């Protein structure tokens, strides 16, 4: 006994899309006037990989503590620039985000020929924090030149630009525009799309 059904044509090497006749009609109309994503002039990236989030993603209280442990005003300014706001997949909502007041200690590994690697010796308060996690961070696979550095990220500069982000996995397509300076973590739920129009 058939209660509901729809005819779906699966031609050649095209991806399978199961839609009602009305949805198929809408899809065809969109495809005739739109540009496929593969033809856009964009780059799609994942978020930052830390290898050990417990050490590199911190609360606002921990950030304030690290900043208060800086010995000089110069160290404090450098450290403020190093610790950036971060969003996780679960922070992304439909058309917006709810920042959980979490921060990324962005001890990046640099970009060859363009951006030097972060030298932890220039950030004693950050080093003191990360030293508490030494046994975990020293053996992680996702690390840079030293255990204090995050892994190489060729698109590091793109995290400083405004971007459209969306969760890769979820019940709904949640996407939003993120202002410059906010990083995103790759919790397997997040992709970053840097648009040239910004």
Label each PLM-derived region with a short phrase.
Residues 3-198:
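Polybasic, glycine- and aromatic-enriched phosphate-binding surface used to engage nucleic acids
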């Amino acid at each position: 006994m058939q209660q509901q059904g729809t005819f779906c044509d699966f031609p050649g090497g095209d991806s399978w899309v199961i839609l009602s006749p009305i949805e198929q009609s809408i899809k065809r109309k969109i495809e005739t006037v739109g540009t496929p994503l593969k033809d856009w002039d964009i780059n799609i990236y994942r978020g930052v990989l830390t290898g050990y989030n417990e050490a590199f993603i911190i609360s606002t209280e921990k950030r304030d503590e690290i900043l208060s442990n800086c010995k000089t005003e110069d160290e404090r300014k450098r450290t403020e620039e190093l610790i950036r706001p971060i969003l996780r997949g679960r922070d992304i909502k439909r058309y917006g985000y709810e920042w959980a007041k979490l921060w990324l200690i962005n001890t990046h590994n640099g970009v060859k020929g363009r951006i030097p690697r972060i030298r932890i010796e220039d950030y004693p308060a950050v080093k003191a924090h990360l030293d508490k996690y030494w046994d975990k961070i020293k053996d992680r696979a996702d690390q840079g030149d030293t255990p204090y550095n995050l892994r190489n990220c060729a698109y590091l500069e793109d995290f400083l630009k405004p971007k459209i982000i969306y969760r890769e996995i979820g019940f709904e397509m949640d996407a939003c525009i993120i202002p410059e300076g906010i990083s995103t973590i790759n919790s397997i739920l997040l992709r970053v799309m840097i648009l040239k129009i910004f």
